[in-house]
Amino acid sequence: MQVKITDLTDQLIASYASVGGINHLDGTNLPCKNGIVGITNDLLQLLFPGFFDNKITHSSEIKMETALLMDSVAGRLEDEISKSISYNPPNETSENNTRGEAKELTLQFLSQLPALREILTTDVDAAFDGDPAAKSKEEIIVSYPFIEAISVQRMAHVLYKFEIALL
């Protein structure tokens, strides 16, 4: 007996109803995991310019490149925060209020990036001071995985303080 794709599709669709584990289909979607990963990668680039991408930026272009990346992150982060706000019960606000709140929270979060950089600098310094094998602070940023992990945790903590769930 040959199984057809339509039969397999029907079985998979049936599992959506019985098992769950799917995003909201008939309402506001939850934040997108892949979208959040992309935003996080770009935030790491903003926190550590030149360390999290292959692009070589000249010092004369850093302001423009940073502004472009910041604008891109802001738009995408606002979308994901809006989804998070819509998910948080009880939520009886209109779509316009949700978007406005998301925009404000996005700007508040992004305003914390300079302070996050200062804190992360102390993390890099501590790793460098505590590891006699480390040759430079740049080596710490490039090759020590905890820097990325602590950066993500510190960003998540800021989101938590702003009561932004699911990001």
Task: Give the location of each predicted region.
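Terminal amphipathic alpha-helical/low-complexity segments used for targeting or macromolecular assembly
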Residues: M1-L166
